[in-house]
Structure formats: structure tokens, C-alpha cells
Curated annotation (Swiss-Prot):
Enzyme Commission designation: 3.5.1.2
Organism ancestry: Eukaryota, Fungi, Dikarya, Ascomycota, Pezizomycotina
Species assigned in the record: Aspergillus oryzae (strain ATCC 42149 / RIB 40)
UniProt name for this protein: Glutaminase A
Catalytic activity: L-glutamine + H2O = L-glutamate + NH4(+)
GO molecular function: glutaminase activity
A GO cellular-component term linked to this record: extracellular region
Keyword Hydrolase belongs to the record: yes
Gene Ontology biological process: carbohydrate metabolic process
Primary residence: secreted
Length: 690
């Protein structure tokens, strides 16, 4: 399969464009989300011109977020003629895609087979923030409906397969597979790495667990596993498969084994369809060392609800109507709230981020003691990175504040159990997902002011949304310890890195200092809420003193127009003052309105085509921080940020899942830095939680 990739992409793309061009609503994203549910179930369709085909499902292989092919193919046979509707199958004409639409949870392609048949191909990755049982299932749906559009009956067969490329990032690894039918009528192919490597990755893919590709065991179903050319060719020739299972277990790249279903829909004069499910079952999900007893194997949360993987699969597949309804409820809520808050450009942004963010987390543990672990994705594989959770946290507060609590839980647990030696807040709980083995030597990436501020701010943000003051009391000692660091370092931050570590270290960072000062005032509120009035008075007094001094140290008063600086005294510099957001989020009113007004006047003077640069060191920007900045800006400046980012989504040449770091002039990746599919884009929801 892979050896045909480059040739097929170029040829098949031309075929796709041979018909009328597809429309894209509300935009044509850089990559179109297909099955996007977890760090390992994350398959996309590249669209941007730097390697994508413009967003046409037929003519290009779907890929894992990291870029390698996860073979997924679809064919349709109409009156004995075969067409490709997904993938880059050689020597097969493609359907004509007429439209694409995305919501927060689904991607829908509309296609035509000549003037005879219309197809609707829907990829649904359900998101149920209030239902952890459903959310714990690492599965996604593919729903294919066909309809005669010429008033005539047509004989139609629908085909879809996956390749063994899903089972391992090592294409030389031996794959093994099996076929079965559950007691409740779900037919499935099970595919897995023959030698399981627990808690191991290869090119970011999981090297353990079992993949399931399933459909209903109904009349007209046939199945087959075998070499890609043989199996796809059998369908094209016969309109059905051999009901045979290839037992020659082999390397993924040896004659590319695929696992296929065909459904004969018979003579279709109106409409008919078929449903597929794809997903990953891992009994053991995470290795975690935060508990007092030491390193613990954390089970996937779904294990508490289902006795076997096939039972989970069976439930998921038969749950389609309910899952689709719940997902539509979320789609509709996000749509209404986004449009009411800031219009269509804002919805274009928010709805594209949802699956991406939730696909960075894994639910583990038990219903009585659940945990959420997050993978940083692409920038590195760090786990529960505090300065990644911080920009992401608005989406969790919007969908269900308890989710943020569960993400922060292991961070507190490791430090409160004495497994981290530094007095400031840790950066992450493990160097590479899925191994949350901590940093017992304190040798994690050092961002002391950044992470202390983030943890204090998020503690109060969660408690306010969840009305959970007991949470603040529970963690008061460590929050107070972190605030001591903020008091010592915030007004004159030492030479250190902030969350924007790729930009380098710097002393006296104006925006970083602001985070620390706001963190101190947040602790004053926490102290007051938890019955520590002396601490509250002390922290508030310090924060007010610092913010008054900060307005002298960090503002270029003589500039035209005035603005905050990147670092103290560097009046020719500037940057996004995104840490201002927490003042408004927490209702602190620590920062004078004049600072907000000053920045509102300034930002339009430095806007580039696709947004406002992060700071004066580069022309690139961070989309998450633009959205934090926009959330507390005036209406006109807010809309300026949203319009630029929505335009970027539609025009960027990048061809991977929504990047948060891009060049504001070209829309491309900055030289040498490629961020992909990161959960930080949960920051798109910053406006919706104010």
C-alpha cells in the first residue's frame, strides 16, 4: 500500500477534481478529522497544499496525526462498475465529492457516483463529557448511506477495509488477526501486533492493544482478510468477498494485509446504508508512579464497565443512535453558544478543536477512583504537562469541570505524596506518554513561575465553576507553597523559560510576571474562601503592590500607541498579553481597565494577514494565546482575531491537524518547528467560560 502512495496521491487527486469541486463548510481545515478519539485513535485526511489533496476523501490515504498512513479504503459498486470513495486505490475511478461539513464531533462527506447515486459518508467520534462510561471507549463510527438520485433502482454493494498499519508504527512488525461475530450480531476483524510491547510506542503509535474493525452481521455481508490488491480486487470483480481469513501472519508491509467487509445492499431505489465501528482496546493503559505504593498499572476505565473487549465493542456498535444523539446535543450547544458569543468565525474555530483536544486524553482507573492522562502530542510526548493543560483548560471547564479535576489529580498526587523534590510546581508527570513515572530527581523542564501560576489559577478556576471549595482546602498547603515562590519571583522574574519555551529564555518577561501576580491574587481569594484571612490579606496586599509596579516596569508609555513590552525596559518590543485572561476569568479585577484598553488600541497596529505575532522576536503566533487574548479584548479586536484565525483555517498550506503555532504572514509552519494536533487548542473555549 505505502509503495503506491506518492503516485496514487497525484493521480487520484486529479480524478477527484475532474468533477465539480467540493464545497467545504464552515471551512476547509488543514486536516479533516476522521476517527479522532484518543492519542492512538487519531486518523485524519490531509487537505492543505503542503502534501494534502484539498480535502477529498477519495484519492488520498488517511494518516495518523504523526503523518504515516493508517490504511483505510472504501469502494462502491453500482450496477457492476466499481468506484473508490476513500483512499488511493490504484486503477479505480473515484466518486465525485460535492461537499464536506464538520461539526464538533462529526465530519460528513457528500459524494456522487455519476448521476445515479449519492453517498453520505459520516465519521462520528462521539464526545460525552458527562458520561465517562461512553467517553472511555476508544472507538469511532463510520456511517455510509446511499441514495438513488435518478429515480431508478441500482444494484449497490459497499466495501470498506482497514490495513494492519493501524496495529503498529513499526511496519516490519508481525501483525496477527482474527475474525469473529459477537453473540449480539456484530461481525469484527481483530488486528494486533503479534509481540505486544506494553507501554511502548513506535512513531507515536501504540505497540500494544487490539484493534477492532466491525459492522453488523446481516444479510448481504461478506468478509475477507488478505493482501490489499487481492481483497480490493475481489470486490471490484465480484461485488462480494470470499468469507475467508488469511492465516499467513506477517510483517505489516509484506503484501499489506487488509481486513475488509462488503455489504450487498441489493436493488436500491430510495436509500440504504451500513455502519462500521473502529477502535482500540487496551486493558492496561498507563504506567503511573504517583501512588504511595509505587508504580501502578492503570487499567483503561472501560474495563470497569465491560468484562471483555468484544463486550465493549458490541455495546459501542449498537449504541450508535444514542451516541449520535448525545453528540448532536453537544454540537448544537457549542454551535449556539459560539455564534451567540461571537459569530460564525468563532464557531469555525471552536468546532474544529473539540475532537482534537479530547483525542489527547485517556480515561483510566475505576469509577470510584478515575484519572485522566493527557499526552502533549507532537511538541514532545510529555504527560499532563501543566503549561499544556493551562491553555487547554477552558474546554474542560465548558464541557464538564470534573474533567479538569481528573487531569490535575495525578499532578497533585505525585507532589503531595513526596515524589517530587523541588519546592515549585512540576512541569509534567512523565517524559513520554504512556509512562507517568514522574521526576523523582526533579529534573523535569524547569518553568517554575509558569507552572506555579498555572496551578494556582486553575485550582481557583475549577473550584469556582464546580462550586467545590473543599478542593481548595484539600490542596491548600501545596497551593500556599507554590504561592510563596510566586511572591519571591513574580515582580522580577529570573531568566527562565515560559510556556513558549521554543522562543527561548528571557529575564523580566512582562507577560510571565503578570501570570505570577495574578496567581498571588488568586491565592488571596483561595485563602479567604478556605478560612485563612491573614494569608488572604497578605497575598492581596502583595498582588496589588506588584501590579502597580508592573504597570511602570512593563509598559512602553512613550510608544505610539503605548503597549506592554516583551520584557521590562525593552520599549521597542511587544507581545500578546494573554496572561491578562486569568484576571477576567477568575473575576479578580486586579488589573486596571486601562491596561485592557491600551492593548485593544495596540493590537490592530501590529496585525499581520493571519493574526498578531506572539512577540517581536518572530512573525509566528500561537493560536491558543490569540484566543485567550481575544476573549478579554473589545468586540472589534476580538472579531479581528477570530476573523484572521478562521481565514487561516481555510487557507493555510499546512496539511496536518490544527497547529497552534504558525507564521502570521505565510500561514505555514515556522521554520524548524511543527506542532500538530495539540490539546492546547482547548483554549478556543476561553470566551465561552467568562
Amino acid at each position: 500500500m505505502m509503495h503506491f502512495l506518492s503516485f496514487c496521491l497525484s493521480v487520484a487527486s486529479l480524478v477527484s477534481y475532474a468533477g465539480a469541486a467540493s464545497t467545504f463548510s464552515p471551512a476547509r481545515p488543514p486536516a479533516l478529522p476522521l476517527a479522532v478519539k484518543s492519542p492512538y485513535l487519531s486518523t485524519w485526511l490531509s487537505a492543505g497544499t503542503d502534501g494534502g489533496n484539498g480535502g477529498y476523501l477519495a484519492g488520498q490515504w488517511p494518516t495518523f496525526w504523526f503523518g504515516q498512513v493508517t490504511g483505510w479504503a472504501g469502494q462502491i459498486r453500482v450496477d457492476n462498475s466499481t468506484y473508490t470513495w476513500m483512499g488511493a486505490i490504484p486503477n479505480t475511478p473515484t466518486v465525485n465529492q460535492t461537499s464536506f461539513e464538520y461539526t464538533s464531533t462529526s465530519s460528513v462527506f457528500t459524494m456522487r457516483v455519476g448521476d445515479m447515486v449519492e453517498m453520505k459518508v459520516k465519521f462520528l467520534s462521539p464526545i460525552t463529557p458527562d458520561d465517562l462510561r461512553r467517553q472511555s471507549l476508544v472507538f469511532s463510527y463510520l456511517d455510509v448511506d446511499v441514495e438513488s438520485i435518478d429515480g431508478k433502482a441500482h444494484d449497490i454493494q459497499v466495501y470498506a477495509d482497514i490495513s494492519a498499519e493501524w496495529a503498529s508504527g513499526d511496519r516490519n512488525a508481525i501483525a496477527q488477526w482474527d475474525y469473529g461475530v459477537t453473540d449480539d450480531g456484530v461481525a469484527y476483524h481483530k488486528v494486533y501486533r503479534q509481540t505486544q510491547l506494553l507501554f511502548s510506542e513506535n512513531t507515536e503509535q501504540a505497540e500494544w492493544g487490539e484493534w477492532y474493525w466491525a459492522t453488523d452481521d446481516q444479510d448481504g455481508l461478506s468478509y475477507q482478510s488478505g493482501p490489499d490488491v487481492d481483497v480490493r480486487g475481489a470486490f471490484a470483480k465480484n461485488g462480494k468477498l470470499a468469507n475467508s481469513d488469511d492465516k499467513n501472519y506477517r510483517a505489516i508491509s509484506t503484501n499489506w494485509p487488509v481486513f475488509a467487509f462488503s455489504r450487498d445492499l441489493g436493488s436500491v431505489k430510495t436509500s440504504a446504508g451500513t455502519l462500521f465501528s473502529i477502535g482500540l482496546a487496551q486493558d492496561s493503559a498507563i504506567q503511573y508512579s504517583g501512588k504511595p505504593e509505587g508504580t501502578t498499572v492503570m487499567p483503561s476505565l472501560w474495563k470497569s464497565y465491560f468484562s471483555t473487549a468484544t463486550a465493549a465493542l458490541e455495546f459501542f456498535h449498537h449504541d450508535y443512535a444514542a451516541a449520535a444523539a448525545l453528540s448532536k446535543d453537544l454540537d448544537d450547544r457549542i454551535s449556539k453558544d459560539s455564534i451567540d458569543a461571537a459569530g460564525q468565525d468563532y464557531l469555525t474555530i471552536t468546532s474544529l478543536t473539540v475532537r482534537q483536544v479530547f483525542a489527547a486524553v485517556q480515561l483510566t482507573g475505576t469509577p470510584e477512583d478515575p484519572y485522566i492522562f493527557m499526552k502533549e502530542i507532537s511538541s514532545n510526548g510529555n504527560m499532563n504537562t501543566v503549561d499544556v493543560i493551562f491553555p487547554a483548560h477552558p474546554i474542560f471547564l465548558y464541557t464538564n469541570p470534573e474533567l479538569l479535576k481528573l487531569i490535575l489529580k495525578p499532578i497533585y498526587e505525585i507532589q503531595e505524596n513526596g515524589k517530587y523534590p523541588n519546592t515549585y510546581a512540576m512541569h509534567d508527570i512523565g517524559t513520554h506518554y504512556p509512562n507517568a513515572t514522574g521526576h523523582p530527581k526533579g529534573d523535569d523542564e524547569k518553568m517554575p513561575l509558569e507552572e506555579c501560576g498555572n496551578m494556582v489559577i486553575m485550582a481557583l478556576a475549577y473550584a469556582q465553576k464546580a462550586k467545590d471549595n473543599d478542593y481548595l482546602s484539600q490542596h491548600y498547603p501545596i497551593l500556599n507553597k507554590w504561592t510563596t515562590y510566586l511572591v519571591e519571583d513574580s515582580i522580577y522574574p529570573a531568566n527562565q523559560i515560559s510556556t513558549d519555551d521554543f522562543a527561548g529564555s528571557l529575564a523580566n518577561q512582562t507577560n510571565l510576571a503578570l501570570k505570577g501576580i495574578i496567581g498571588i491574587q488568586a491565592m488571596a481569594v483561595i485563602s479567604n474562601t478556605t478560612g485563612h484571612p491573614d494569608d488572604a490579606s497578605n497575598h492581596s496586599s502583595i498582588a496589588k503592590d506588584y501590579i502597580a509596579r508592573w504597570q511602570t516596569l512593563g509598559v512602553a508609555h512613550d510608544a505610539n500607541p503605548p503597549h506592554t513590552t516583551l520584557s521590562y525596559g525593552a520599549n521597542e518590543t511587544h507581545g500578546l498579553l494573554y496572561n491578562l485572561y486569568a484576571d477576567r476569568e477568575l473575576g479578580l479585577n486586579l488589573v486596571p481597565q486601562s491596561v485592557y484598553d491600551m492593548q485593544n488600541t495596540f493590537y490592530p497596529t501590529v496585525k499581520e494577514k493571519y493574526g498578531v505575532p506572539l512577540d517581536t522576536r518572530h512573525v509566528y503566533t500561537k493560536a491558543d494565546w490569540e484566543l485567550f487574548t481575544a476573549a478579554v479584548a473589545s468586540e472589534s479586536v476580538r472579531d479581528m482575531f477570530h476573523q484572521a484565525l478562521a481565514t487561516w483555517i481555510n487557507e493555510t498550506p499546512t496539511n496536518r491537524a490544527f497547529t497552534d503555532l504558525y507564521d502570521t504572514q505565510t500561514g505555514n509552519y515556522p521554520a524548524g518547528i511543527t506542532f500538530i494536533a495539540r490539546p492546547v487548542m482547548g483554549g478556543a473555549f476561553a470566551l465561552l467560560i467568562l
